[in-house]
Amino acid sequence: MKAKAISHIAVFVRDLDKSLEFYRDILAMTVTMDAIQDTTGGSRSQTYKHRRATRRVVHLGWAESEVPYLVRPCHPGDQPDGEPIKLDQVGVSHYSFTVDDLPSLAEELAAKGVNIPGGINAFKNSQGELSSFYVLDPDGILVQFDRGDGV
């Protein structure tokens, strides 16, 4: 098999409105879909841990980009199981966005109160350069920003 591309990345959240404040309002992603979906049919009984009747799903992306989009599902009024994982645990530990100006973005996010674990200086190398840094979203999920050069 040869896949054409990654279609989307779905990350379950506890509070979709708080998640939207971060991804839409702070990171300037665009909401391309916001819907309540029926989860009672099809393969849902095999792909869900608990029975749920509906879910709210939001698709987020950047209008000018053709890269994969994020899907943010949640079940309003129903708390999900589990905790976010760290980089050395099994599962999807983080996702990363390539940006042009890391130092400016780091300053902007810090000014908006976004949690940068250890502070931005923790991510600088011995020459004081910044090739990437992580933040925590409202659910404690690691989100990385990098230069796109694989360093």
Segment roles from a protein language model:
Residues 2, 11, 34, 97-151:
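Vicinal oxygen chelate
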Residues 5:
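Beta-rich catalytic cores
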Residues 8, 90-94:
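Eukaryotic phosphotyrosine signaling hubs
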Residues 12-67:
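Core segments of cupin and vicinal oxygen chelate
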Residues 40-44, 81, 125:
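A cross-kingdom feature marking solvent-exposed beta-strand/loop segments within repeated
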Residues 53-54, 91, 129:
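Exposed loop/turn and edge beta-strand positions of beta-sandwich/beta-sheet ligand-binding modules
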Residues 65-68, 77-80, 102:
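Short, charged/polar surface micro-motifs in flexible loops or helix N-caps
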Residues 73-78, 148:
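Acetyl-CoA-dependent GNAT
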